[in-house]
Amino acid sequence: MSEDENWVLTTPAPPGVREAYGAAPSQHVWIRRPPGNERLRTLVMIHGGYWRSAYDAEHVGHLCADLARRGWATVALEYRRIGEAGGAWPGTLTDVSAALDALTGLAAKHGLDLGRSAWMGHSAGGHLALWAVTRSSAPGALKRPGWRPRRLVGLAPVSDLVEADRLELSRHVTLELLGGSAREQAARYADGSPAAHLPLRVQTVVIHGTKDNVVPLAMNRSFVDRARKAGDDIRLVMPEDADHFDVIDPKSKVWAQVVDVLGTP
């Protein structure tokens, strides 16, 4: 990360407009956009933190504010997480669906052009963004959102829950998220893992720094390869010497690559 490498996580973000999509304290979104009433191309951002309540949407407010200055309407999703009532399985995942569906009712009020949208998620939020577009339609599967983006950007996403379980990432956080191991909760892993539901069927870019020591780059090399073989339009961008947080730091050298991938509003 640039300058003080913890600044994104510790500095309050520029304010946004808070809109609730449910009754729980964490069921809300933060909307930031340039002044004016015109409908703008919309970026939906899902934050990471390995699904734990210690991390919230505040730290992605910096990148959302930066993109708003560049002409985007941005929406940072908050959701119930491990450690909160209703968090973990299935509430963490169903909150993302509920938040995305709620945006259809907020679009006119805030000038959100959902027909020209991108979804972007970082780390565990990358998992949730990928999950939302790869939802199974099998009977009994978790509810999928009612609309899809034009483009999906995964920033060092946790793209394979079974692999995350095998590697015991972040003190074996998948046990907390899914209530057991992949062997013990096979159906939940199958329903919740993007890698189990390829192809994505949306243009996708995965950005993963070569110095990331939080989510293994090998996981996304494999995921992108499998998605491409399944017929997806997907590519992997690997910024040299970038760590796990450089990709969400608007002061980092890597940020220009993220902006370029998103394109012009």
Residue ranges of predicted features:
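Catalytic nucleophile-loop/oxyanion-hole region of alpha/beta-hydrolase
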Residues: 55-64, 75-116
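Structural cue for short, hydrophobic secondary-structure segments
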Residues: 45-48, 76, 206
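Primarily recognizes the serine-hydrolase "nucleophile elbow" in alpha/beta-hydrolase
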Residues: 101-167
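Short, surface-exposed "cap/lid" segments of acyl-processing enzymes
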Residues: 35-39, 43-66
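N-terminal cap/lid segment of alpha/beta-hydrolase-fold proteins
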Residues: 1-37
